[in-house]
């Protein structure tokens, strides 16, 4: 069986609060949030509400540097690498996640709520069914 780190909605609310505080410390005004469909959708909406950001863009070919990019987890770095080339000004790009995988190197653009406990698969409340179906 695959070891998991199960995350509750209460955990998510705490992480959103912590991540919002970390983002506000940057003293940046983000005009929007950009995300990828699936994993980033729920955290994007919650962060948008918390930060008062009205626009959320999904699956964009170009990412504005004044848009906060949001995903659920920084894991292998593959998502970051894929979208980084789409950013109009990489020096101003911020990549925000609820979790960052423990014991890996992070890009300087990453801001996160907390590190994972270990290398277990993180199961978010919105993907429990997907995970369950994937192991059957």
What residue ranges belong to the model's regions?
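PRPP-associated nucleotide enzymes
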Residues: 1-136
């Amino acid at each position: 069986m695959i070891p998991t780190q199960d995350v509750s909605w209460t955990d998510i609310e705490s992480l959103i609060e912590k991540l919002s505080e970390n983002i506000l410390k940057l003293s940046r005004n983000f005009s929007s949030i950009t995300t990828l469909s699936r994993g980033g959708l729920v955290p994007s909406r919650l962060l948008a509400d918390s930060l008062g950001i009205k626009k959320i863009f999904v699956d964009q070919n170009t990412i504005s540097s004044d848009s906060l990019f949001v995903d659920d987890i920084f894991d292998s770095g593959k998502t970051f690498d894929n979208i980084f080339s789409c950013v109009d000004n990489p020096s101003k790009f911020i990549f925000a996640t609820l979790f960052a995988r423990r014991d890996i190197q992070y890009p300087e653009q990453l801001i996160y709520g907390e590190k994972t406990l270990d290398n277990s698969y993180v199961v978010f409340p919105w993907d429990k069914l997907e995970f369950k179906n994937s192991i059957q």
